[in-house]
């Protein structure tokens, strides 16, 4: 869904069009071993349903760890996890750190502002140096789409890479935790109508969610938003597009709200935040148009009074905080699975 491309240099360049995503220098599926096992998690696109379900099933086993007096299992004891966040994050970085710690891994958070990359060192030189320190797993967030693919191609063979968000392209662990949340409350994906609302054009979460939902057999995925914030190509993916929020919400079982990604916008795509809320904000009245037992989700950070009303965010149908809780178990599952697979 995005044509952001990556050069073979240390500083990937993001192109403007969001319609396709291809890396011509990669052969086959770079996420999988020769035996079809998950070695890296770079995108949900192209993953077999069996692998997605395996991650969700494994996460279900880890949820109970949170309730233990000692919140640890020894799965990654002796392994080193490097969190490489070239783009700011609070929620994602923290949950990855907690997840790795609960797996008994040694965790290092690279201070990008104080690292050699801020002094002109290329991305690949940084990765090669960290690989030489016998890192086992890189968790990477980068502003340029494709950066985790570049790292996965060039890192040492023993290193595993998890994409924690790259540009507008993908946020696979968020997509997986969203799927876990939906499965927890709704169980059967094949009977659901799911609406994704808001700034889909700039949202890597939306892309990952759409790929995950279609992979898991959801029969109706709706994209709802203003024309200026919807990418092309949605219909070709089997997504129903709505430019009216009230129409799009009718009868849906799951609502995934997205914030406005102002930091990724170039030019004025909307009149104002206040006007946006009047037309596109999820209020109790609009929520009533959905199925009576519909759940409301949000990947965060959440902007109250812009895309969602506080009464909805804090209401009985909101599962937003549970998404955060489930996210730890899902990231534990992903790290545990990839670290156990190698060519």
Swiss-Prot record:
Residues engaged in binding L-aspartate: 119, 204, 259
GO BP of this protein: 'de novo' pyrimidine nucleobase biosynthetic process; 'de novo' UMP biosynthetic process; amino acid metabolic process
EC number: 2.1.3.2
InterPro entries in the record: Asp/Orn_carbamoyltranf_P-bd (IPR006132), Asp/Orn_carbamoylTrfase (IPR006130), Asp/Orn_carbamoylTrfase_sf (IPR036901), Asp_carbamoyltransf (IPR002082), Asp_carbamoyltransf_Asp/Orn-bd (IPR006131)
Catalytically driven reaction(s): carbamoyl phosphate + L-aspartate = N-carbamoyl-L-aspartate + phosphate + H(+)
Keywords: Pyrimidine biosynthesis, Transferase
Pathway where it operates: Pyrimidine metabolism; UMP biosynthesis via de novo pathway; (S)-dihydroorotate from bicarbonate: step 2/3
Entry GO MF terms: amino acid binding; aspartate carbamoyltransferase activity
A GO cellular component entry from the record: cytosol
One matching Pfam family: OTCace_N
Binding residues annotated for carbamoyl phosphate, in chain numbering: 91-92, 141, 171, 174, 300-301
Role, per record: Catalyzes the condensation of carbamoyl phosphate and aspartate to form carbamoyl aspartate and inorganic phosphate, the committed step in the de novo pyrimidine nucleotide biosynthesis pathway.
Subunit structure: Heterododecamer (2C3:3R2) of six catalytic PyrB chains organized as two trimers (C3), and six regulatory PyrI chains organized as three dimers (R2).
Family: Belongs to the aspartate/ornithine carbamoyltransferase superfamily. ATCase family.
Protein name: Aspartate carbamoyltransferase catalytic subunit
